Amino acid sequence: RKLIPMADLLDSLVMVPLALPGIVLAFGYVVTYTDTFLDPLENPIPLLIIAYGIRRLPFMVRSAAAGLQQTSVSLEEASATFGASRFHTLRKIIMPLVFANLVAGGLLCFAYAMLDVSDSLILAMKDRYYPITKAIYALFLEAGSGEFIASALGMIGMLILTACILGASLILGKKMGELFRSA
C-alpha cells in the first residue's frame, strides 16, 4: 500500500505480458528452455504453467490492487493504534477484505488461461500433454467425426469460461467494474 520508488515503472513492467503477443513469448520459451530441465519437447506442463501464469499476471495484480484501493486505510491505522503488528493487520484485516478480489482475479486468470491458444499450440508438442485448446485443434484436423468432437469441446470450454466469469461477477458484485482500473 505504501508508495515505493519507481512504482509507475513497476506497474508498467507488470503490464508488459499484455502487450507482447503470446506466440512470440511461446517461441521464446521454446528457444530458451530446450535442452534444460524445463524442455518443452519432453514435458511442457511446467513451462505451460509458467507461461499461463506470466501471461495472466496483470489480471491478478490489477485485481489485488483494486481490492487494496477499496479497503480503507483507516482500518490499518486503527489496527496499528491498538498495537497490532503489520503481519497481524495483514492477516486479520486486509486479507479478509481483499480475499474476494483475489478469488475473482484467480477465476478470471484460470478462465483466460484455460482457453489460451498461442502458448498451448507452440509449447505442447506431444499429444498426451495437449491442453484443451490444442486438443480441439488436433481433433478438428481429424477426418470423420473430429470436427463434431472439437465443436463439443469448444462448447464445454465456453461454458466453463462463462461460469468462471459469472462466478467472478457474483463474488465481486458491483466491484467488478473497478477490477481493471489503473492502480
Name each region found by the language model:
Residues 1-3, 42, 113-114, 144:
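Helix-loop interface residues and adjacent transmembrane-helix termini in multi-pass membrane transporters
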Residues 2-10, 23-55, 87, 123-128:
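Membrane-interfacial helix termini and adjacent extracytoplasmic/periplasmic loops
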Residues 4, 65-76, 80, 84-92, ...:
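C-terminal transmembrane helix and the adjacent membrane-cytosol boundary/short C-terminal tail
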Residues 13, 50, 90-95, 104, ...:
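Hydrophobic core positions of alpha-helical segments in small-molecule transporters
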Residues 27, 47, 54-76, 114, ...:
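Membrane-embedded alpha-helices of multi-pass transport/permease systems
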Residues 114, 120-163, 167:
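Interhelical loop and adjacent transmembrane-helix boundary motif
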